[in-house]
Amino acid sequence: MNDILEIAAANQQRAREVIRDTDLEAIWRSVGAEANLVGSLRTGLLMKHRDIDFHIYSSPLRVADSFAAMARLAENPRIRRIEYGNLLDAQDQCLEWHAWYADADERLWQIDMIHMPVSYTHLT
C-alpha cells in the first residue's frame, strides 16, 4: 500500500511541475477563461496514467480565443503534439484539446482540456 501512495505522490508532484512549466492556468486567463483542474490529479488518485485534466470555462466561448491559448501553449518546447476537436454543435457543446508534454525524463504527459461556455459549470 505504501508503494502505491508513494507512486501517487510522486506523480502528483511531477504533474504539478508540468502545470507550472506550461503556465497553463495563466495562458487560459490571458484569453479570459478559467482553468479548473479536474480528474485524478485533483482527487489525488493519479497513478500509472500520466494525464492532467482541465475544464476550461469562458463567457462567451470563442474558438479564436481557444486557439490563441493553445498557440501560446505550443510555444513551450516540451509540448510534442496537440489535437483539437470542435464539438460545439454536439451534445457536449465544447472544444476538446489534447496536448502531449515531454518531461525532463522524456516521459509523455497527456493534458486534456475541455473548453466550455460558463453555462456548463453545473456539470463539474
Q: Residue locations for each model-derived region?
A:
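Conserved catalytic core of two-metal-ion nucleotidyltransferases
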Residues: R78-M116
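Acidic-enriched, low-complexity/disordered segments with a strong bias for Aspartate over Glutamate
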Residues: D3, D21-D23, D51-D53, D65, ...
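Generic structural hydrophobic/aromatic packing signal, biased to beta-strands
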Residues: W28, A35-L37, L73, A99, ...
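Active-site nucleotide-donor binding segment shared across nucleotidyl transfer reactions
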Residues: L24-F67
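Conserved small/polar residues in nucleotide/adenosyl-binding loops
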Residues: T121-T124
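Helical scaffold of the NTase/Pol beta-like nucleotidyltransferase catalytic core
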Residues: M1-V38
